[in-house]
Amino acid sequence: MANPRVFFDMTVGGAPAGRIVMELYANEVPKTAENFRALCTGEKGVGKSGKPLHYKGSTFHRVIPEFMCQGGDFTRGNGTGGESIYGEKFPDEKFVRKQPAPGVLSMANAGPNTNGSQFFICTVATPWLDGKHVVFGQVVEGMDVVKAIEKVGTRNGSTSKVVKVADCGQLS
């Protein structure tokens, strides 16, 4: 069975920015990939937080040029929230893959075994993160969109324009 592909249709400052297509490594980290896939489709309904378990309408709250673009906090929108489809947090699955190149999709966390819904897309190789963040996918189309998002980031992570997931779902 092929790994699932999901998408984000992004806006920057309210204007359409394009589509990011990501392949999820369900063959290597099935629980982590399933969490992200289901949060893209919204199929799990409402979570314990009372908010929909869905990335649609959420923002990329932290964007640091020459590092990464982070999103997935659909409960608070500021990097302090988020929720997995398994409950608030779930354990690290495996550290099979490294962070070797731009476009790597990894779980954001607050230390070991604290995965929720927050994720980041690397814009450069980040080998110092190996073994600390579960790699669960890769951008396969739309790195130009990721680079456009990166341009509205700052060294402290705030964005000069709102970066939003206008729509998202599963392609295959």
UniProtKB/Swiss-Prot annotation:
Q: What is its EC number?
A: 5.2.1.8
Q: What is the activity regulation entry?
A: Binds cyclosporin A (CsA). CsA mediates some of its effects via an inhibitory action on PPIase.
Q: Does the keyword Kinase apply?
A: no
Highest taxon of source:
Eukaryota
List the GO molecular function terms. cyclosporin A binding; peptidyl-prolyl cis-trans isomerase activity
Give the keywords, sorted: Cytoplasm, Isomerase, Rotamase
**One GO biological process from the UniProt record?**
protein folding
Gene Ontology cellular component?
Answer: cytoplasm; cytosol
- Which cell locations does it reside in? Cytoplasm
Q: What reaction does this catalyse?
A: [protein]-peptidylproline (omega=180) = [protein]-peptidylproline (omega=0)
| Domain PPIase cyclophilin-type residues, every copy | 7-170
- Principal place of residence: cytoplasm
Protein family (similarity comment) = Belongs to the cyclophilin-type PPIase family.
Protein function: PPIases accelerate the folding of proteins. It catalyzes the cis-trans isomerization of proline imidic peptide bonds in oligopeptides.
Name of the protein described by the UniProt record: Peptidyl-prolyl cis-trans isomerase
**Organism ancestry:** Eukaryota, Viridiplantae, Streptophyta, Embryophyta, Tracheophyta
